[in-house]
């Protein structure tokens, strides 16, 4: 399910949209997962401003260094330490970073079902078209999603 969306022009960088996207979410946020393009202090600060207990899962860049802030290590610093100690693949497994692939799958569904490009010409109309596409996709996903129940095997 897509819980927030925005359409910007090519002059807007993705990390600058973290705040506006989070503002669209009415429910408590427990976790934010994003790709490495979002790595950086501004993203972490924006997320922290929206709630204290939000877990941030963003892979640090390969050139990342720990922050020089005094006090306890930041979430990003803990990610860097874990990667240094156990490796990037172990970090991905421990943080469940692989869940991000579900987001990529959803975007693939959008492009396959709604279309790979917008049809409207004006920017405001394109924003409306994108929002309508998200609403349609969410309705389709909700309709077709099975209600799964985890069952434990019965001992013989």
Can you annotate each of these PLM segments?
Residues 105-108, 134-138:
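Short, residue-level hotspots on alpha-helical faces of the histone-fold
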Residues 1-53, 57-61, 68, 72, ...:
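Polybasic low-complexity intrinsically disordered regions
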Residues 80-86, 114-117, 142-156:
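A short, flexible helix-boundary coil/loop motif
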Residues 36-112, 120, 124:
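Helix-centered, glycine/charged polyanion-binding patches within enzymatic domains
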Residues 118, 123, 130-132:
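C-terminal/domain-terminus segments
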